[in-house]
Design a protein with these regions (language model features):
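Donor nucleotide-sugar recognition loop
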Residues: 207-213, 222-259
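A conserved acidic beta->alpha catalytic loop
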Residues: 84-93
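Conserved donor NDP-sugar-binding/catalytic core segment of glycosyltransferases
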Residues: 142-181
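A recurrent flexible, glycine/aromatic-enriched loop bordering the glycosyltransferase active site
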Residues: 185, 193-218, 232
Length: 518
């Protein structure tokens, strides 16, 4: 497209050499978006637009981050969009001197927030703000590594339905963390170079991601950029949910590592931060009808481990998730199988809570069924599955054994079902645990203690695995605090009440695996 000429209030856009997109008769949302985006592109457009915003911290964050970027991204065609968001330490001057020809610099005179910095730079642009096929958001507390961007682009270009990818890192939660055990910057880069080997088996589908650094399709970014209601965190969660509900895959590239220094915000008031997190969580729940934490971070690591302890992994596996909330346990089973070379899976979900239907439907090719638990077999019919995972504690159902029997009836030959049980219903809260230890609550009628005998009599191979991994950190904190209390140190009775044995009895959970004989 040629130059744009302004004549009073008229803008002339020369499109003589452009051709309209040809969509043919294929009804494919993803292909059509790619074709439409290609029409407005220019021959000299870069492959990637890297957006980098900084507010002070020139020496300790910005310089190292950009030095690493220039060194380890030399093989990628990219433009660099630099935004100085009100810095007073020479950041703007450093941007001007940065030895990279394909850069654009925006200077914001006063910092009034990261959202404003991005929007102001975008609005000030004559023409397209993001000119690359892919958008990369690179914070100044990230040190990139060898092959970081190449690996993520390989992932993106493997499937046009992948809309948003993020690498592994340190100083991050959400099971995106990896410890390379390095001693300094040079050692980190050496170990990252060995780690960063593209491997499709390590591309994990997720419901949400924390974008330490992210790659997003530019047309998708323009379709949904951000919801500015999320001023109290959770903007990242919002982006993940928005893109996935549009039908796109959200992928964690666990074959790629970048170093995350941590927040550049100093002097954070922890109480205020916690309050803001809760505000953002409430806003997210109001928008999406689900909780960004409890409904999404149920990775069920131990259930998956118990399931495959003695169960053969199968290609073309049919997997059913029952009451798995938004569906993380289902995706994690798919990821586990993919990591072990089983690339084809079909996911199906059954939920007793309709608010989860939309998120489950975004990735369950086998369909989503919704109804009371006693309608399970009626809804599913005669379908069978290689793996069944049940996401809620079994004592939440009125008749535990009836539910297990009904679900297990849908196992294929050699298939396996995994569910979780407990003996006590105690929240994961230090104060609640302390109160329960002082006055032990009654065992759950539908808990493991009351059901174990009948479970073992079911016509399946039944194995029961006790575990405490989900409360391990909680236990460590609980007893670390107790050891600081003088009465605990000096009083044998108090130590007996708050003993590790009683804690374990209260908080132990059980993975129950049923295998149908071939």
């Amino acid at each position: 497209m040629g130059m744009r000429f302004l004549q009073d209030d008229v803008t002339v856009i020369h499109s003589d050499e452009k051709e309209a997109a040809v969509y043919a008769d294929i009804l494919d949302l993803y292909t059509n978006r790619e074709k439409s985006a290609a029409v407005v592109s220019e021959p000299n457009d870069p492959l990637v637009s890297i957006y980098f915003q900084a507010y002070n911290h020139l020496e300790d964050y910005t310089k190292p981050a950009l030095d690493a970027l220039l060194r380890y991204t030399a093989d990628i065609d990219y433009e660099l969009i630099l935004v100085d968001n009100g810095s007073t330490d020479g950041t703007f001057e450093y941007f001007q001197l940065l030895p990279y020809p394909r850069k654009r610099i925006y200077r914001i005179t006063k910092n009034i927030g990261a959202f404003f910095g991005y929007r102001a730079a975008k609005n000030a642009t004559q023409g397209r703000f993001l000119r690359g096929k892919y958008f990369v958001g690179l914070p100044n507390d990230i040190l990139v590594t060898k092959n970081w961007l190449q690996n993520m682009l390989i992932c993106m270009e493997s499937d046009e339905r992948i809309g948003f990818v993020v690498p592994m890192s340190d100083n991050v939660s959400n099971l995106q963390y990896v410890d390379l055990g390095y001693s300094d910057f040079g050692d980190m880069q050496e170990k990252a170079a060995l780690f960063n080997v593209s491997d499709p088996r390590k591309w994990y589908d997720r419901l949400r991601l924390i974008p330490t650094v992210c790659v997003i399709r530019t047309y998708l970014r323009e379709l949904y950029e951000a919801d500015y209601a999320f001023v109290y965190d959770f903007a990242d969660d919002d982006i993940s949910f928005a893109y996935r509900r549009l039908g796109y895959r959200i992928v964690l590239c666990s074959d790629t590592f970048v170093h995350h220094e941590g927040s550049t915000i100093v002097g954070v008031n922890q109480q205020e931060h916690s309050e803001n997190l809760e505000k953002g969580r409430i806003l997210f729940r109001r928008k999406y009808g689900v909780d960004a934490w409890s409904d999404v971070v149920n990775f069920e690591v131990y259930l998956r481990r118990a399931l495959f302890e003695r169960t053969q992994m199968r290609e073309n596996a049919r997997i059913l998730g029952i009451d798995v909330r938004c569906g993380t346990p289902l995706l994690e089973l798919r990821n586990t199988l993919r990591e072990n070379g089983m690339n084809q899976t079909v996911l199906t979900a059954y939920t007793t809570e309709p608010q989860y239907w939309q998120d489950l439907a975004s990735f369950c090719e086998g369909g989503v069924y919704c109804g009371d638990i006693d309608r399970l077999s009626c809804k599913i019919g005669d379908k069978t599955y290689d793996y069944i995972i049940m996401g809620t504690y079994m004592d939440c159902y009125e008749d535990v054994l009836a539910v297990i029997r009904a679900a297990a009836a849908h196992l294929s030959d050699g298939g396996a079902l995994v569910c979780k049980m407990r003996n006590y219903d105690v929240p994961y809260d230090l104060q609640e645990i302390a109160l329960a230890l002082q006055n032990m609550p009654p065992r759950l009628v539908q808990g493991m203690y009351g059901c174990e005998t009948e479970l073992l009599q079911l016509p399946y191979e039944v194995e029961i695995y006790p575990y405490m991994e989900e409360v391990y950190d909680l236990k460590e904190r609980f007893f670390a605090q107790l050891r600081e209390v003088e009465a605990y140190q000096n009083d044998a009775h108090i130590r007996a009440v708050f003993s590790e044995e009683r804690f374990d009895a209260l908080m132990t959970q059980y993975a129950v695996v049923l295998r149908k004989r071939s």
